[in-house]
From Swiss-Prot:
Family of the protein in this entry: Belongs to the universal ribosomal protein uS11 family.
Role description: Located on the platform of the 30S subunit, it bridges several disparate RNA helices of the 16S rRNA. Forms part of the Shine-Dalgarno cleft in the 70S ribosome.
Pfam families hit by this protein: Ribosomal_S11 (PF00411)
Self-association state and partner proteins as the record states: Part of the 30S ribosomal subunit. Interacts with proteins S7 and S18. Binds to IF-3.
Transmembrane stretches, start-end: none
Coiled coil residues, start to end: none
Organism whose genome encodes this protein: Moorella thermoacetica (strain ATCC 39073 / JCM 9320)
Protein name per Swiss-Prot or TrEMBL: Small ribosomal subunit protein uS11
GO molecular function: rRNA binding; structural constituent of ribosome
């Protein structure tokens, strides 16, 4: 009887990507940072909630900074060096997230605002009276 080959678990090869796109979605309640390759395949992502902020603290610029830092560190393990920033939404963490990506060691080549603006589409929610 021939010796049986033991099934060895396959090691997943890390994708080595030089440049990518950082999608920053900043809402009034949270900030999401997704870093993708040029084709749009996600390499890493983080949000203010996944970094450990809860409730109203998620909407702060500091939370956005921490989320961007976490996503950048994860992406730099794949060899990422340069990103284009696509910023969407009206939130407080827009600039903080971009600055944090630069501080983490990523070179930001382009900053583009891709906030969707309606040509008078849906009716917006009513104004708050506090």
């Amino acid at each position: 009887m021939p010796p049986r080959k033991t099934a060895r678990p396959r090691r997943r090869d890390r994708k080595h990507i030089e440049s990518g796109i950082a999608h920053i979605k900043s809402t009034f309640n949270n900030t999401l940072v997704t870093i993708t390759d040029k084709n749009g395949n996600a390499i890493s992502w983080a949000s203010a909630g996944t970094v450990g902020f809860k409730g109203s603290r998620k909407s702060t610029p500091f939370a956005a900074q921490m989320a961007a830092e976490a996503a950048a560190k994860q992406a730099m393990e794949h060899g990422l060096r340069e990103v284009e920033c696509y910023v969407k939404g009206p939130g407080a963490g827009r600039e903080a997230a971009i600055r944090s990506l630069q501080a983490a060691g990523l070179e930001v080549s382009v900053i583009k605002d891709v906030t969707p603006i309606p040509h008078n589409g849906c009716r917006p929610p009513k104004r708050r009276r506090v």
